[in-house]
Regions:
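Detector for Asparagine
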Residues: 8, 19, 54-56, 100, ...
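N-terminal amphipathic alpha-helix/helix-capping segment at the start of soluble metabolic enzymes
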Residues: 1-44, 73
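A short alpha-helix capping/helix-coil boundary motif
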Residues: 26-29, 51-54, 78-83, 103-104, ...
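Short, acidic/polar
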Residues: 40-51, 95-104
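Hydrophobic faces of well-ordered beta-strands that scaffold small-molecule active sites
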Residues: 31-39, 59-62, 84-88, 113-115, ...
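Active-site-adjacent beta->alpha loops and helix N-cap segments on the catalytic face
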Residues: 64-79, 93-98, 116-132, 140
């Protein structure tokens, strides 16, 4: 078995950007998941724009307990400098609206969409037929 050598990686931090939300360093040892050729190992679950801009997480999962709105999706995508997975409904928001919000999120640049339980399989199927980005389904 080969001994894994630790690479010396130069780190640059500015005075104003030195205080960020850092994921645990052990995350770098995991395999992660590859989406569209980009390996993602860490996800930050937030809609807080200040946190989105000040983290070293590889991606953001942005889900909130209100009816999704295209303007909120746009603001989250614009704020993120890493891939973002946006909530598009599934609780109160159902049916064609979920599919339309998913398509809107794809057009705005989201890497994926999140639907909440109790989203029906039919809605997930319709979403899959309409968009070409990953769909994350939460469970309770």
């Amino acid at each position: 078995m080969e001994i894994k050598r630790k690479k010396n990686v130069p780190e640059i931090k500015g005075i104003l950007r030195s205080n960020v939300i850092e994921v645990p360093s052990c995350i770098r040892d995991c395999s992660g998941i590859k989406i569209f050729g980009k390996r993602l190992k860490s996800f930050l679950f937030t809609t807080d724009v200040a946190l989105i801009r000040n983290t070293n997480a590889d991606a953001i999962i942005a889900v909130y307990p209100f009816t999704p709105q295209p303007l909120i999706t746009e603001a989250l995508v614009m704020a993120a400098d890493v891939p973002i997975f946006c909530g598009v409904g599934g609780g109160i928001t159902q049916g064609k609206r979920v599919v339309n919000l998913g398509l809107d999120a794809e057009f705005k640049g989201a890497m994926g969409v999140v639907v909440n339980a109790p989203t029906s399989n039919e809605i997930v199927e319709n979403l899959r037929e309409t968009i070409d980005i990953p769909i994350i389904v939460t469970v309770v």
